Each structure stands twice: as C-alpha cells, then as structure tokens.
C-alpha cells in the first residue's frame, strides 16, 4: 500500500517556475501527495534528474502512453503530469540513478520541448486550481468510493482490509481520490484519466466506475476458478490446467491457443520436408504433447524439442557461386598472398561446377597467430556465397558442447554444431572450428573424440546429436578448422583433416599488406582522411625490424594503430597539417626500439647461431659454450631445455671428442657449460645439433665462428646431419636477423623451394650431409686441427722417409704401409 508522506511540507505552487525538466515514467502514474521510489536509467531522464538536482529539485513526472517505447517522442507522452520534488537520490555504479519523488500538484503541460544541448525534455506547465467541493452529494460519493474500495480490497486480496480504515480518516475528497487511485492496480490509461480529472467530484465518480468494473472482473475470475475447482473434484488432477482453459474460453469466447500451436507444428512438419526418421520422431512427440497439460514442465520440454526439430534446415541450402574469377577477386581483395588455401578453394569450386554435387571439404589452416586464418575463412564464405558460422573450441572440455545434452536433463540443448547450422538456416554453411588445438578433456568427456564423427566424410552424412536424437546430414557443410600447432591435435583427428600450412609473411608481403590494407584501415578507424598521414616505406621496414617480431601482422597493425592515434592528436593540434612519419622520427611515435639485430654480430669463440621453429614462427637461437677447468667432467645445461635438446648436447660433445678436438684438455677434470639465452622461453627439439656441435668445437679449438652465419640440423654421434622441419620459417627468421649464410641438411633441399624467391636470392644456402663439411666452412681461422690427425700421421711420414732412403728388401714392408696410409688419408679427406 502506497501512503502519503504526512511529514512533507507542500510548497506554494505560486512560487514555482513555469518551465521545468520533465521525466517520462513507464507503467505508473504519479499523483499529488504520493511518494514514489524510481530507478532512472534512460539518458534523457538522467539528464532531467541532474538538472533538477542542480537547481530547485523540481521535475514534472509524466507517464508515457506505451511502456514498450524506449525513446518516446512528444506524441508518446501524456499532457497531464505531477509536479514532484526529488527528496532523495543515489547514483548507482551502472550509471543509473535511484530517486524518491514526492508528488506536489497536478500540472497541465501546455508545451513539451526537447533541448538537444541539455539532452532533456522541458515542460511549460499550467497549475490547475484545486477546487474545494463539499455537500451531501460529495459526502455520499466519498462513502460509496470507500465501500467500493473495501470490496476491491476484499476480492483482490491485494490490500489488507484493516488498512481501509486509514482511508476512512481522510476528509478531503480530492486527497481521498488521489490516495485511492495510487493504491489500486488498473490500466495506466485509467489512472491517467483520474489524474486529468481536475474537479474532485468528477474524480470520485470516475474512481467509483473503475473500482466497480475491476471488482466485477475479479469476481468473474473467481467464478471461473470455482468452476475449475468443481471439475477437478470429478476428474483426475492431471486435467486441471486443461479444464481451467476450457472454463476461461467458455466465459471469454477465446480460441484455444494451445490447440492452435499444435496445429502450427503439425503444418510445419508437413511443409519443411523432414526426412522419414525425423518426421516419425516429430509426429510421435507431437501426439504426446497434445495429451499433456499446456503449462506443465513436460509440455515445455516437448515444445522446445519440436521447435528445434521442425526448424532445422533439412532441405534448405544456399547456391554456390561457381564463378572462379569472381571468387578469386573476393579473396584477393581481403587477403594478400595465401596462395595455397585460395588455390584449394578454387579447385573445390571447379570440381563442384563439373560434377554438380560434391561433399564439403574438411580443411585445417595451420600456422602462427595473426597470419589471416580466421579472416580468410570469412572471405571464403563470401567468395562461395555461403552463410558463415564460427565456433571457438579454445578451452572446450565438454563433449556435450559438440554433440548436445540428452533430453532427460533439465535445461538440455543441442550441441553448438546443430545450433550453428540452425542459426545459419542453411545446411551447407562455411563452418569455422576455431582453435581446434586448444581443446582439452576431463571427466565430462573428450570433445576431440566427438569431432571424429563430425569431420569424417564417410560418417558425417548421419551426424547424431544427443538432443535431436535423429541423424542430420552435415556432409554438405564446408568445415574449416584453425590451429597454431598440429602436435596437440590427436592423431586420429588430424588424419581426417586436409592440412594447409600458413607460414609467416615475408617482409615484402608485410610491406604490401601494410600499404594496401593496414594503414588505410587504421586511418579510416581513427578518422584520418587521405593525405593527412604519410608513413614512408623506410619507416614501415623499421617497424617490422625494431618493433615487432612475429610471423603474422597482428602486432604490426597494433603499432600502426599507435602511430595513427598520435598522428590524429598532432593533426588536430596543428590545424590540419599533414603528419609525416619517417625512419628518423619513428621513435617519437613508438618509443625506444624493442628489438635489436645482435645475434649474428657477436659470434666468437664458443658462440654459434642456430635456427628454431615455434608455433608463432621462426626464431634465431644464440648458443654459448664455456669450459671450467678444475672440474669433474660434468655438462651443465641452462636455458629451460627439453629432454630432446639435452640429449642433442650430449651427442654433440661425443662427436667433438671422437674427432680429437680439444688437445691438451683433460675432459675428466673439465666442466662444460652450454647456455641458450632467453632462459625464460622453453626450448626443445634436435634441430640445434649442428649449432651446438659447432659452438663446442669452437670452444675446444679456440677458433671463432664466422659472423652472419647460422645453421640448423640434427647431428648424430658419428657426425651425420639429419633433416629437420620448419625450413621456410627458419630461413625467414635468419633473413630478418641479417644472416648471410645458412648451413642446412642436404635432405631438406626439397623444402627450400617453399622459401620466397626474393629471400633465397639474398641468402647463401649451403646444404651439408656431415659435420665435417660444416667444420670446413664455419670457422674464421679455417678448419680446426684435430689432435688425432697429428698423433697418427707424423710417425707414418717418418717411417716412409726411412723406407725411401733404404734399398734393403726388409724396408719394403713399411713402403707398402705408406701407400695404404696415403690412400686411406686421401679417402678420408675426400
């Protein structure tokens, strides 16, 4: 019950202003004397409240005609309101304001204008005179109103009957009418009519009619409930809701909405062309629904299931754009390079055009972040004219995310595959399964195992979702998955994917992407018109070398965005003068360079440069070796190394010792420390074997490694150089760091063709089969001397000289040894 505030002192309306801020309120009509708590969240209403708080705390509270209108116009607001004072206000964290309004007097709004500057409505108001009425007729009306109100309180059970005694103490007819009107639950329009009734006598008569009508409606509702209760005594309780609906329909002559809904579902089952098994399941469920109570929990579950089943795009598909030229133009407009995936899509379209029927391919775009895997999938959907659906698999650990929940569970839903296809309203969309390598598994199941059926061309024609419980054909869907690393994808799942590698961009490709895509896009986003910002090509190259180190262009674009923000500020401050970015003033925009090319410039004794590959692209790897005399023959390894790399270091030292390097060193009393800088970064793999071996030989022979030389390859204890992976990424990283010469395994020559020609021309690429070849090339002072060669060759040469001087037959035997030794030495050198 809303009561008036007796402690409030009503101001004199003659002293109040004629123009006040106005607040449009929904679902409630304010009355004089009424105290109303109100939560204000709309911007125009907040502005009006703030204006009132800053001045005299008075606002006009006026109801809007339709509560659903979020941004009402002048015609949506009534022309009678209540002058109200803000007695309390509280600003909430979400920006809204909670206020308490105290109604003061009726006002008639003569003009309602919106002020764009203040973002608020302003009302020019007229204060109608509060007429004083009395006499027997008024007294009779007041008594009749109180009787009707008491009956209303009795039948509605919304107001305690004892509380009616409070209203009988009110002697002023105007105040009585306003107080009762603020405490009954009726339509907003009826309340507004009471507010607009300026004469208290008219107001009393109107309220009597409203209350009498409301009492009649409530009595009719009670009568319907009584009939239903009588029927329940004769029939089973499970038909309670059905009988209630029949009683309501009999009284109000309304159509059976539940039966209408069943008829609509039956019509959809016939029209939507469901497959035989799906149609049988839908009809069976519909028959069950028809026997249920309309508002029972079971009927809600059944209706939801039928909605999913009949609204699935069983036969709805989009027509592919089979124009190869147009498809290529669409993909080229959005992405520079990426020839392999584009070529694969064009091949699919060509075959589809020739056969008129083809299963959707299941592709996997594998590569480092920021190279355009996800965005290319969107372009493919646009190029082939299909709907696009994206599902992120990162962090997914529940099998039900893929295959849905069974309907026996509360709140069960289809899996996200079926949800995505239903949302697309097409059975052949381009469906992107993003970050497939980031899935996990726990007690809820393994999502990767659930994907086996989905991504198998031989099985996905009958993909079974636990919720639908009928097979759905997803063979027409073009599935595209993305991954940064293939190693974390289960072998059985990887076997079902057609892998397309996305290697990092070259500097030349990044330059083209920056000039044609990144810079224009960032300028547009930051409001910079053409000609307001100029970024020179040398500055673009410097950004790539000194500020970003990545295979893709995500951080590259972020740096360009930083330049655009600072350029926008300078452009505004300099009154529209063009901002030019050069390599000389680049640090003013981006600060101190984050990276320096130091790796290949510091090679010396015990230092070599290797090449590594990670999921985010290629990297150069500096390797340092040091010896500690008076030790215990230990090998110390630092740099957060994996087991494979540790074993590679041991193999390298074994090879170096077997070749006799390290004359005069007592290996039993010397410790060797091998360090890989950037110790916080985990490192593993055998491909640094050649670089580790070279660093150890350099240390043992005190022969420095050549500058601007890097190498990669696995080494065995006999010195054979074995093949490695990530050739393209490693070579691109070496080129970026200023390396001039690269030694790589001979068996990887076939992979060199994948390296862009513009990079191959600027690098000296030397394939090697054995560590002996690397030893001849890698050192500043030439090939290091082996202690074994010296100890074995000198005595044999001396015996050969003695044999040459002697003519005795007995000396011929060493001469034969000389010949064999010469042949053996020649063979070894070869």
From Swiss-Prot:
Its main location: cytoplasm. SMART domains: AAA, LON. Residues 784-830 are annotated as: Disordered. The keyword Metal-binding does not apply. Induction: By heat shock. It is found in: Cytoplasm. ATP binds at residues 367-374. Its EC number is 3.4.21.53. CDD domains: RecA-like_Lon (cd19500). Residues 802-830 have a biased composition (Basic residues). One of its GO terms (molecular function) is ATP hydrolysis activity. GO terms for cellular component: cytoplasm. Residues 20-215 form the Lon N-terminal domain. PROSITE patterns: LON_N, LON_PROTEOLYTIC. The active site is at residues 687, 730. Homohexamer. Organized in a ring with a central cavity. ATP-dependent serine protease that mediates the selective degradation of mutant and abnormal proteins as well as certain short-lived regulatory proteins. Required for cellular homeostasis and for survival from DNA damage and developmental changes induced by stress. Degrades polypeptides processively to yield small peptide fragments that are 5 to 10 amino acids long. Binds to DNA in a double-stranded, site-specific manner. PANTHER family: ATP DEPENDENT LON PROTEASE FAMILY MEMBER. This is Lon protease. It comes from Elusimicrobium minutum (strain Pei191). The gene is lon.
């Amino acid at each position: 019950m809303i009561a008036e505030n007796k402690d409030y002192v009503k101001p004199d309306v003659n002293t109040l202003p004629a123009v006040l801020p106005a607040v449009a309120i929904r679902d409630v009509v304010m009355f004089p004397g009424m105290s109303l708590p109100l939560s204000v969240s709309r911007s125009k209403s907040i502005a009006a409240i703030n204006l009132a708080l800053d001045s005299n705390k008075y606002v006009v509270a006026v109801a809007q005609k339709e509560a659903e209108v979020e941004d009402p116009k002048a015609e949506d607001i009534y022309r009678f309101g209540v002058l109200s004072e803000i007695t309390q206000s509280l600003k909430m964290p979400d920006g809204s304001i909670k206020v308490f309004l105290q109604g003061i007097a009726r006002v008639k709004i003569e003009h309602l204008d919106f002020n764009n500057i203040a973002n608020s409505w302003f009302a020019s108001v007229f204060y109608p005179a509060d007429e004083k009425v009395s006499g027997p007729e008024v007294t009779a009306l007041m008594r009749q109103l109180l009787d009707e109100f008491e009956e209303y309180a009795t039948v509605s059970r919304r107001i305690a009957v004892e509380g009616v005694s409070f209203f009988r103490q009110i002697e002023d007819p105007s105040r009585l009418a306003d107080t009762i009107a603020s405490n009954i639950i009726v339509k907003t329009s009826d309340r507004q009519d009471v507010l607009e009734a300026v004469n208290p006598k008219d107001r009393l008569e109107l309220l009597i009619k409203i209350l009498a009508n409301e009492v009649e409606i409530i009595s009719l509702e009670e009568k319907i409930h009584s009939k239903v209760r009588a029927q329940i005594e004769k029939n089973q309780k499970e038909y309670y809701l059905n009988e209630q609906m029949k009683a309501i329909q009999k009284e109000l002559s309304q159509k059976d909405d539940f039966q209408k809904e069943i008829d609509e579902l039956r019509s959809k089952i016939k029209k939507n062309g469901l497959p035989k098994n799906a149609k049988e399941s839908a009809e069976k469920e519909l028959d069950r629904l028809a026997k249920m109570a309309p508002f029972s929990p079971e009927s809600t579950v059944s209706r939801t299931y039928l909605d999913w089943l009949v609204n699935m795009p069983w036969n709805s598909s989009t027509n592919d754009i089979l124009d190869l030229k147009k498809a290529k133009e669409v993909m080229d407009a959005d992405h520079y390079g990426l020839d392999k995936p584009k070529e694969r899509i064009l091949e699919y379209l060509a075959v589809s055009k020739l056969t008129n029927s083809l299963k959707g391919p299941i592709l996997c775009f594998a590569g480092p972040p920021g190279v355009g895997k996800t965005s290319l999938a969107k372009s493919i959907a646009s190029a082939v004219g299909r709907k696009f659906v994206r599902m992120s698999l990162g962090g997914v650990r529940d099998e039900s995310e893929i295959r849905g929940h069974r309907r026996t569970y509360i709140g069960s839903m289809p899996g996200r595959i079926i949800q995505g296809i239903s949302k697309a309203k097409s059975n052949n969309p381009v469906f992107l399964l993003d970050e497939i390598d980031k899935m996990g598994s726990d007690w809820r199941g393994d999502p990767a195992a659930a994907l086996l059926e989905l991504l198998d061309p031989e099985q996905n024609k009958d993909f079974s979702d636990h919720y639908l419980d009928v097979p759905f054909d997803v063979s027409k869907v073009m599935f595209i998955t993305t991954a940064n690393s293939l190693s974390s994808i289960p072998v059985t799942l990887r076997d079902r994917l057609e892998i397309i590698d996305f290697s990092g961009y070259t500097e030349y490709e990044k330059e083209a992407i920056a000039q044609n895509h990144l810079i224009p896009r960032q300028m547009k986003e930051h409001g910079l018109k053409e000609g307001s910002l100029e970024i020179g090509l040398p500055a673009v190259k410097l950004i790539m070398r000194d500020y970003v180190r990545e295979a893709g262009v995500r951080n590259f674009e972020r740096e360009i965005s930083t330049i655009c923000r600072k350029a926008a500020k300078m452009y505004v401050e300099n009154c529209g003068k063009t901002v030019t970015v050069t390599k000389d003033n680049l640090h003013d925009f981006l600060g101190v360079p984050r990276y320096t090319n130091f790796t290949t410039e510091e090679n010396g004794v015990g230092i070599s440069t290797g090449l590594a590959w990670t999921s985010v692209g290629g990297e150069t790897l500096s390797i340092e070796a040091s010896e500690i005399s008076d030790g215990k023959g230990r090998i110390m390894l630092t740099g957060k190394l994996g087991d494979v790399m540790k074993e590679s270091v041991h193999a390298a030292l074994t090879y170096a010792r077997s070749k006799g390097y390290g004359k005069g060193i007592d290996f039993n009393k010397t410790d060797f420390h091998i360090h890989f800088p950037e110790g916080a970064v985990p490192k593993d793999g055998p491909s640094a074997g050649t670089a580790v071996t070279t660093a150890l030989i350099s240390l043992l022979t005190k022969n420095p490694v050549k500058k601007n030389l890097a190498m990669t390859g696995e080494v065995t204890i006999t010195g054979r150089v074995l093949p490695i992976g990530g050739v393209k990424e490693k070579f691109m990283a070496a080129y970026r760091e200023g390396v001039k010469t690269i030694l790589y395994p001979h068996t990887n020559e076939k992979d060199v063709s994948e390296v862009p020609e513009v990079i191959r021309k600027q690098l000296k690429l030397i394939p090697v089969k054995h560590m002996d070849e690397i030893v001849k090339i890698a050192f500043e002072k030439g090939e290091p001397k082996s202690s074994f060669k010296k100890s074995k060759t000198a005595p044999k040469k001396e015996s050969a000289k003695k044999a040459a001087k002697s003519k005795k037959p007995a000396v011929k035997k060493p001469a034969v040894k000389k010949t064999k030794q010469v042949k053996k030495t020649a063979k070894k050198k070869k």
